[in-house]
């Protein structure tokens, strides 16, 4: 038990070289409190070494930092603070049930900490790997990587927000966030991204109820799909964007699918979920069991794709038919 009524606790090791790596271990209770709680601070910092977190850290309304070249945070840990910063070289979020492993943070302790009122920031010099499902209903989770953020298991956000900050290492132009699972977002939650030194993007979250009306109202916006969509009995879908009013924005499906899209407009050009793409971006979306009929420039996802528009990590299944420039994913 370590208690600091003055509000600050700083445990650190400082190794002179790689032969003298330090270890900071926490398996008990560390508590820092001040009169207003806001200035409470606990910092566990293993310079060039390993920080093993397996106990309780309480900074109440203040700040907790757990850092080290190697950082291991098990699901036994309990963190109470306004903000918790996790800062290793690489980090893998997995199911760390009481066993300390290299560069691992337990998914359970992250979601419990978020749901108990703490904003959590995981910051890695290289990659962040989400290898276990994370679910939470309040506060903000920030994943900040020098290189890639690899989302290999679902992230479920029913309240609060998610921020993905990537390619933060100096000179990194290739880092990305890679969606290999689903990021499920309820309406009213926030989703933000930032690549390198580029400006932050605040995305608009859309679901089944507002998908079409929102995208069609502003074809230059930045949108993410928060849930899977199943369209049933709809054969009068009007493609988003046409030759006179192109879609020029960004759309990220976040690993979701849109099923049963049906368009029956045999005499009309530029048919698909999106009719006319101009300098736009779409990624991480799947169309399943689509039935699309048009004239020229017909594809399940995009009818006409031009001006360096990009489509990545996306697919379509179903039937597409027309008379000219017809493709399964993109017509032209």
PLM feature segments, named:
Residues 1-203, 209-218, 258:
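Extracellular and secretory-pathway beta-repeat/beta-biased strand scaffolds
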Residues 154-332:
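Predominantly extracellular beta-rich ligand-binding scaffolds that present long acidic/polar faces
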């Amino acid at each position: 038990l370590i208690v600091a009524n003055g509000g600050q606790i700083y445990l650190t090791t400082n190794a002179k070289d790689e032969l003298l790596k330090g270890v900071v271990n926490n398996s008990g209770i560390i508590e820092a409190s001040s009169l207003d709680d806001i200035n409470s601070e606990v910092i566990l910092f293993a310079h060039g070494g390993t920080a093993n977190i397996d106990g309780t850290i309480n900074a109440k309304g203040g700040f907790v930092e757990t850092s080290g070249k190697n950082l291991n945070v098990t699901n036994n840990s309990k963190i109470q603070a306004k903000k918790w910063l996790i800062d290793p070289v690489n980090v893998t979020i997995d199911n760390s049930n009481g066993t300390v492993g290299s560069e691992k943070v337990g998914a359970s302790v992250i979601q419990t900490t978020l749901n108990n009122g703490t904003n959590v920031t995981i910051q890695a010099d290289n990659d962040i790997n989400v290898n276990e499902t994370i679910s939470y209903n309040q506060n903000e989770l920030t994943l900040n990587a020098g290189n890639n953020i690899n989302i290999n298991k679902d992230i479920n956000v029913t309240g609060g927000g998610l921020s993905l900050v990537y390619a933060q290492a100096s000179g990194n132009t290739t880092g990305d966030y890679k969606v290999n699972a689903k990021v499920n977002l309820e309406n009213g939650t926030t989703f933000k991204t930032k690549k390198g030194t580029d400006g932050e993007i605040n995305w608009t979250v859309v679901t089944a109820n507002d998908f079409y009306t929102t995208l069609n109202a502003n074809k230059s916006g930045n949108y993410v799909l928060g849930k899977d969509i199943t369209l049933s009995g709809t054969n009068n879908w009007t493609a988003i964007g046409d030759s006179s009013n192109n879609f020029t924005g960004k759309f990220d499906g976040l690993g979701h699918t849109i099923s049963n899209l049906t368009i029956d407009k045999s005499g009309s050009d530029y048919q698909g979920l999106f009719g006319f793409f101009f300098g736009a971006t779409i990624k991480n979306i799947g169309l399943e069991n689509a039935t699309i009929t048009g004239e020229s420039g017909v594809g399940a996802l995009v009818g006409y794709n031009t001006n360096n528009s990009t489509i990545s990590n996306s697919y379509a299944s179903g039937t597409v038919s027309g008379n000219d420039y017809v493709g399964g994913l993109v017509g032209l």
